[in-house]
């Protein structure tokens, strides 16, 4: 019988937010009864993916389920992470060699297409909005030079509108893709929205959510609610936390892992 191990693959950040989120998810998996749960980061934070691979090989792991804790695929996934896992483009299941130790590698997909994400966005919007105002949901994506992130953001915005019944649903991107956050804020105001509930479809806080996004939605760093005046009207803005610590995402990870006989 093979000795199985789990690697939760994270982006990594110079802030501790991403690491805390990853560590929380890993500990929840252990509490659920999963053994040999490891974390590997693509950049900045340790242990790096390659360091975790070596550690798992030393521990005698000969089958790895690598689960990316990402909303969507993108350049990091297609140009960096896959090769750090000793795979080639298009490969998801392969026997790899780590310091002379043969390991069966299974590389799973991000979770952004799962219908659960729209439910999480729906709950965040309903918990945050003021029902006495015309409130609009602004789903904020990172943006990418590849199409994956935009596809996931638009998919979940569409589900929030069509399946959850919310009329005023908008989306925007911090960089690379369009529409920009500023453009979408203007459109929401022009459409008559009185309150903007900004929901970042991100894993964790970090440089973008702390430094880039707040001024684009007329807030200062660390402030979750405020107002601004445009077209002679006062608009309320509420800024939600990212989704990565939601306990239901642990269930999604578990579902992906159980496919491999855990």
Describe the function of each predicted region.
Residues 1-262:
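Active-site-proximal alpha-helix that buttresses catalytic centers in soluble enzyme cores
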């Amino acid at each position: 019988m093979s000795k199985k191990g789990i690697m939760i693959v994270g982006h990594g950040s110079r802030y501790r937010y991403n690491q805390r989120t990853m560590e929380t998810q890993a500990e929840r998996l252990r509490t659920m009864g999963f053994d040999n749960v490891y974390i590997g980061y693509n950049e900045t934070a340790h242990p790096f993916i390659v360091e975790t691979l070596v550690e798992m090989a030393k521990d005698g792991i000969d089958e790895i389920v690598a689960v990316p804790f990402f909303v969507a695929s993108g350049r990091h996934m297609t140009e960096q992470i896959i090769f750090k896992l000793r795979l080639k483009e298009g490969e998801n299941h392969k026997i790899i060699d780590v310091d002379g130790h043969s390991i069966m590698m299974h590389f799973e997909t991000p979770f952004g297409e799962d219908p659960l994400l729209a439910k999480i966005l729906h709950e965040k919007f309903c918990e945050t909005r003021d029902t006495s105002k015309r409130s609009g949901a602004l789903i904020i994506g990172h943006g990418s030079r590849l199409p994956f992130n935009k596809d996931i953001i638009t998919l979940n915005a569409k589900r929030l509108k069509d399946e959850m019944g919310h009329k005023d649903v908008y989306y925007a991107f911090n960089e690379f893709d369009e529409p920009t956050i500023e453009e979408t804020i203007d459109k929401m105001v022009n459409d008559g929205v009185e309150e903007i509930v900004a929901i970042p479809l991100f894993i964790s806080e970090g440089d973008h959510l702390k430094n880039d996004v707040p001024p684009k939605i007329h807030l200062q760093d660390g402030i979750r609610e405020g107002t601004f005046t445009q077209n002679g009207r006062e608009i309320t803005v509420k800024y939600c936390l990212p989704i990565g610590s939601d306990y239901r995402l642990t269930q999604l990870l578990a579902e992906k892992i159980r496919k491999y006989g855990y």
